Amino acid sequence: RSGTSAPKALQGWISPQGLMEQLEKDIATANSVLQNTPFDLLRDPDGLNLRKYQINAIEAAERAIIDGKQTVLLSMATGTGKTRTILGMIYRFIKSDRFKRVLFLVDRTALGEQAEDVFKEVKIEELMTLDSIYNIKGLDEKEIDKETKIHIATVQSLVKRILYPESATMPSVTDYDLIVVDE
């Protein structure tokens, strides 16, 4: 626990495995790695090829997280590349070990399918996609696998898993350490 950690109420009990994961986190080192990692991969014309405003958005989100903020809002107009921007941001957060497991939450199945397609098609590093670098679970997969780095789900499916759990499909409070909500 760092001196800047603010207390917060948890919505459930942390499992022993979740507690171990929390104790193994080295947020200071991850923040340092994140700050010192250049944005060259995100600018690469053979990769994401993000524009200046997209990289500025990622930098602002990273600064907020490093400064201890719990929530960040990125607002971008339709057609400005929100999904590609988020892809770059998620990649940097996972690569730096700042976050271990990401929930990408959408309000419609079509948005989830679109995001999943982008994650599986857009090249990031050494002509590899996010899906080929990290394990991604799509909309149709409900079980939370500890090796999964990114899980795409609709709000409705998540509410169903929380309110009407079937076997082990109910997420624990430590299953995701970053939640990205698209629209």
Predicted regions located by residue number:
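Walker B catalytic acidic pair
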Residues: D182-E183
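Conserved helicase motor
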Residues: T109, L130-E141, V155-K160
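ATP-dependent helicase/translocase motor core
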Residues: R1-R101, V106, A110, Q114-E126, ...
